[in-house]
Amino acid sequence: MSYLKFDKNLMINLEQSLPKEMLRTNQSGAYHCTTIVDCNTRKQHGLLVVPVPELGNSWHVMLSSLDETVYQHGAPFNLGLHRYQGGVMNPNGHKYIREFDCESVPRTTYRVGGVILTKEKIFISGANRILIRYTLEEAHSPTTLRVRPILAFRDASALCDGYPRLFMQFSQQPQWTYDPHWYNGFEYVKDLERGVPYTEDLWVPGYFELPIKKGESIIFSAGLNEVDPSTLPQMYEKEIAVRTCRTSFFN
């Protein structure tokens, strides 16, 4: 049993969940870091942060986060959570979280009505790539998953103002909708507390959308090179097989 496990009561209480940060690294020098409710509170937070030797000895936030939305009967349920200027939290997707654990990989369980969806994140050991596996554990009607990437492309110690290409792929063929706009006024509370610059605007180019069936898993990949999407499930299973289960403080 995982000792890094938090229930709904803690996860929906942002005074308890927001201060809890999670850092994952790999052998290529990339990292993923955010809070356990996937709300970035520092400029260094990001879903995929990588070294770019051509731009100096620093890390660069490529993919800040993803906004996932579950659709049932045409109704959207946004699982994302961000803090905007003035301390405004939106869209409050943390209220759907039922459990978070980190026994082998970070795993968040969401419940939206009759839908139970899990999200697991894992780094590929020797490459600048993160995989996210979405599994629809329960559903009583047709369900659609929409994934909206929020891009930064900046130094991890700077704010957004010759980068590598970022390849975003799915294990199944998604529908892409080009819907470009800026998300304005992200606020990083830890930087605010430190008295350093703490707000920025981030670019959203559009969104991916694909149906997901009960018992089905869909894998999202973000990396600096393109891969064969059909290999993503095997890539995920190979990576998770070498992970150590975190069942105590000592392992």
For each of these PLM feature ranges, what is it?
Residues M1-F250:
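Terminal accessory carbohydrate-recognition/targeting modules of carbohydrate-active enzymes
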